[in-house]
């Protein structure tokens, strides 16, 4: 069967840019052919962060939905122009959207992503697949994470026991085996990025160097690790609606002492490393492949190696683009009416065809 061309769009909880990828996909492979990281406007980022903190109006939700749709379409068109690609050669765009709120538990669980897919379809001239999470949640699932299904497609078929760790704003683990498992371990980069932005006027702590200059505040670390999320059994998923500025400030206030900013950064890095290693070590895996922005944090990777000395840790191929590739692949699955194997990951009653199609 001939390979088909799909585009994937991902904008994660870190809000550091829009990742757009071009993939060639068939039943056995998904090959990355091109990618671009499109800048996220500062004013839009600030507005979304304000909305995620629970302060927004219906008018804001509507206008930001359209603004994001325009931003995502501009990002796609930039890739097409750079690579000199005819839009007619693309079967579909898979768009994750920008998560505004993820509420997987309660009487009426939901997950809200913004980024009007109709606007993307009109402005690019390409069919769009979006709204992936809703069907899974209607079937009783968490609606996240979805990457494990793609990880199994991409990295499965080996005799070695392999886990994949994606470190984005949140961190999620995929455990490959007879039964596919995957869930969010907790915060990835989100708290570190938030803290360094507040104190250093940069968007992230390059290579974890600022964290490296500090010392762990153990009472703070222990208090944060007592959060019920970390002991909650999987399936589970989380986001900025849980691990955010208010959550961190609550723990800082409880220390009743003046804390050095670089020591807090060091402690936040340790929180990410320990919460990840606590989960990875449950599965007795031989190999851990890292992807996502956190894979470029040298000090975080170093700490993971120290906490898990018997596991071979490496960086996955195309590590920066695997999340966006996931949604290109999910678009392929939708257009071919193929079920996505996620019920053991999300807790849904059955596997399903995911996503709505916008033309």
Swiss-Prot record:
User: Organism's domain of life?
Assistant: Bacteria
Enzyme Commission identifier(s): 2.7.1.170
What reaction gets catalysed by this protein?
1,6-anhydro-N-acetyl-beta-muramate + ATP + H2O = N-acetyl-D-muramate 6-phosphate + ADP + H(+)
Instruction: Report the protein's function.
Output: Catalyzes the specific phosphorylation of 1,6-anhydro-N-acetylmuramic acid (anhMurNAc) with the simultaneous cleavage of the 1,6-anhydro ring, generating MurNAc-6-P. Is required for the utilization of anhMurNAc either imported from the medium or derived from its own cell wall murein, and thus plays a role in cell wall recycling.
Name this polypeptide is given: Anhydro-N-acetylmuramic acid kinase
Q: Which organism is it from?
A: Sulfurovum sp. (strain NBC37-1)
| GO BP terms, alphabetized | 1,6-anhydro-N-acetyl-beta-muramic acid catabolic process; amino sugar metabolic process; peptidoglycan turnover
Keyword check for Mitochondrion: no
Classification via InterPro entries? Anhydro_N_Ac-Mur_kinase, ATPase_NBD
The record's similarity note reads: Belongs to the anhydro-N-acetylmuramic acid kinase family.
Q: Where does ATP bind?
A: 12-19
Which pathway, per its entry? Amino-sugar metabolism; 1,6-anhydro-N-acetylmuramate degradation; Cell wall biogenesis; peptidoglycan recycling
What keywords were assigned to this record?
Answer: ATP-binding, Carbohydrate metabolism, Kinase, Nucleotide-binding, Transferase
Q: Which SUPFAM superfamilies match?
A: Actin-like ATPase domain (SSF53067)
Identify one Pfam family in the record.
AnmK
Top-level enzyme category? transferase
Gene name per UniProt: anmK
- MF annotations from Gene Ontology: ATP binding; kinase activity; phosphotransferase activity, alcohol group as acceptor
Source lineage: Bacteria, Pseudomonadati, Campylobacterota, Epsilonproteobacteria, Campylobacterales
């Amino acid at each position: 069967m001939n390979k088909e061309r799909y585009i994937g769009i991902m904008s994660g909880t870190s809000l550091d840019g829009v990742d757009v990828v071009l993939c060639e996909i068939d039943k056995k492979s998904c090959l990355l052919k091109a990618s671009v990281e499109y800048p996220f406007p500062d004013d839009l980022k600030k507005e979304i962060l304000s909305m995620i903190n629970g302060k927004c109006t219906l008018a804001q939700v509507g206008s930001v939905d359209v603004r994001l749709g325009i931003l995502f379409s501009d990002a796609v068109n930039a890739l097409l122009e750079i690579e000199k690609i005819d839009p007619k050669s693309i079967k579909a765009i898979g768009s994750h959207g920008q998560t505004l709120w993820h509420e997987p538990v309660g009487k009426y669980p939901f997950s809200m992503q913004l980024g009007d897919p109709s606007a993307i379809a009109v402005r690019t001239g390409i069919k769009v697949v979006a709204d992936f999470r809703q069907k899974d949640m209607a079937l009783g699932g968490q609606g996240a994470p979805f990457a494990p299904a793609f990880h199994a497609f991409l990295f499965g078929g080996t005799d070695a026991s392999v886990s994949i760790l994606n470190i984005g704003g949140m961190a999620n683990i995929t455990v490959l085996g007879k039964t596919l498992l995957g869930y969010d371990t907790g915060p990835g980069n989100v708290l570190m990025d938030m803290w360094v932005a507040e104190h250093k006027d940069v968007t992230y702590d390059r290579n974890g160097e600022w964290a490296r200059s500090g010392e762990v505040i153990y009472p703070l670390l222990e208090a944060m690790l007592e959060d019920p999320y970390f002991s909650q059994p999987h399936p589970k998923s989380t986001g900025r609606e849980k691990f955010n500025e208010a959550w961190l400030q609550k723990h800082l206030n409880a220390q009743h002492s003046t804390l050095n900013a670089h020591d807090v950064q060091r402690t936040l890095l340790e929180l990410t490393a320990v919460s990840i290693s606590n989960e990875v070590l449950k599965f007795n895996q031989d190999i851990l492949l890292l992807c996502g922005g956190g894979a470029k944090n040298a000090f975080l990777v170093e700490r993971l190696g120290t906490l898990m000395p018997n596991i071979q840790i490496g960086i996955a191929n195309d590590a920066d683009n695997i999340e966006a590739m996931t949604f290109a692949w999910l678009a392929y699955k939708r257009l071919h009416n193929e079920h996505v194997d996620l019920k053991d990951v999300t807790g849904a009653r059955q596997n399903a065809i995911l996503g709505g199609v916008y033309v």
